[in-house]
Structure formats: structure tokens, C-alpha cells
């Protein structure tokens, strides 16, 4: 009953307890389908128009392609309530400038499960002129096991420094996009034949 991505997003937005909808542009991956930027922009516009919740847009994890994607999508969705994942150390200038400075939208600052890297990236983004009120931290994510525990430990350290030490460079909200990580865990992709005891 969902013919398009926008239909899926509308259905997801209507679910009880949903605060926002995340659109992952995996089809843009140059090592996969390599969907053109223009097609991804049209998809993002359709999803944004279909939902009444804030929209989070995640790229395809290709630094070059994501830079092109976020700039064009931010331009097309100017004035909308959108958070873009993610600005990383390798591309923060382009992403933060295109999304935050040029179009006044929100930027996710992605670091690799390390409080010092998270703070450093926040400082760098603020130094290019982006208001920290438009930054959301993505301190890393994991779906299970030690990785998840390490992510939670990092988040606790960030919150502790932000609150007890009044560290303004760690006082941004945190988002942890775990959903995509779940598909890299063997329990999610194992067939019933491989692991019959899991059902």
C-alpha cells in the first residue's frame, strides 16, 4: 500500500510516538545504485511535503556525493524544519556552510564515538559562523554489544561535561541513528535456516 518513498514516510509519520522521520538516501551511493542528485532532491521534496513532522535527511556515506546532495536538498527545502546528517571532520566546512549558513537549517555533527572528537567538531563548526543552536551531535552509533555500550558511555560523558562543567561546546542535543546500524548485525540478517533457534 506504499507505492513511493513519500507514501512510506507519510505512513511512518502517522505511527504513534513518532517525533520525526529520517530519510536515508542510500540509493545515491556511488558504489551502489548511484542515483543522481536531482532524483534525490525530488524524493526529499516529496517526503517533506507528505509529512507533518520534522525531517532528518541522511546521505549515503560518500563524502563527495553527500556534499552535493545536502547543498541541493537544503536549497530545495529552504524554510523547512530539516536536520542534515552529517557533517564530519572531512566535510564539515562544506556541509555546515551549505546547510546552516546559506539556508538556515540544522546540521548533524558526526564524530567517531569520542568525546574529544565530538567537541572538536562542534568548535570547528561554530568557528565558521554557524550558531550552535543549529547543531545536533551524532556521537556515533552501534546496534548491539560492546559498540552500543561504548556509544552510551560516550553520551554519558558528553552529558556530564555539558551539565557539570558547563561546557557549551557539548550542550547540543544528541541524535543516534541506530536504525541503519541494525542491518549490519548478524542477528538482523541471518536466515531462519542459518539460525533456527532465533525463529
Briefly describe each language-model feature range:
Residues 1, 19-23, 53-59, 80-87, ...:
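Hydrophobic faces of well-ordered beta-strands that scaffold small-molecule active sites
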Residues 1-7, 11, 32-35, 59-63, ...:
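Active-site mouth loops of central-metabolism enzymes
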Residues 4, 32-42, 65, 113-116, ...:
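Alpha-helix N-cap and loop-to-helix initiation/capping positions
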Residues 5-14, 42-44, 93-96, 123-125:
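Short, charged beta->alpha transition segments
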Residues 12, 73, 137:
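Conserved, mostly hydrophobic/aromatic
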Residues 17-46, 51, 57-63:
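Glycine-rich, proline-tolerant flexible connector loops at the mouths of alpha/beta enzymes
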Residues 36-45, 71-81, 192-198:
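Short, electropositive alpha-helical surface patch
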Residues 90-199:
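Catalytic alpha/beta core domains of metabolic enzymes, predominantly
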Amino acid at each position: 500500500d506504499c507505492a513511493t518513498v513519500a507514501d512510506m514516510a507519510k505512513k511512518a509519520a502517522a505511527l504513534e510516538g513518532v517525533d520525526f522521520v529520517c530519510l536515508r538516501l542510500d540509493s545515491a551511493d556511488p558504489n551502489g545504485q548511484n542515483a543522481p542528485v536531482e532524483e534525490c532532491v525530488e524524493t526529499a521534496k516529496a517526503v517533506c511535503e507528505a509529512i507533518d513532522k520534522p525531517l532528518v535527511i541522511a546521505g549515503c556515506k560518500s563524502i563527495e556525493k553527500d556534499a552535493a546532495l545536502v547543498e541541493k536538498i537544503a536549497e530545495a527545502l529552504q524554510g523547512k524544519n530539516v536536520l542534515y546528517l552529517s557533517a564530519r571532520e572531512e566535510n564539515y566546512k562544506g556541509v555546515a556552510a551549505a546547510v546552516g549558513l546559506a539556508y538556515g537549517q540544522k546540521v548533524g555533527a558526526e564524530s567517531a564515538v569520542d568525546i574529544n572528537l565530538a567537541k572538536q567538531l562542534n568548535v570547528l563548526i561554530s568557528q565558521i559562523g554557524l550558531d550552535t543552536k543549529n547543531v545536533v551531535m551524532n556521537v556515533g552509533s552501534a546496534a548491539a554489544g560492546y559498540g552500543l555500550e561504548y556509544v552510551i558511555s560516550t553520551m554519558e560523558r558528553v552529558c556530564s561535561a555539558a551539565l557539570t562543567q558547563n561546557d557549551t561546546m557539548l550542550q547540543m542535543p544528541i541524535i543516534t541513528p541506530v536504525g541503519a546500524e541494525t542491518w549490519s548485525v548478524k542477528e538482523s540478517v541471518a536466515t531462519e535456516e542459518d539460525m533456527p533457534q532465533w525463529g
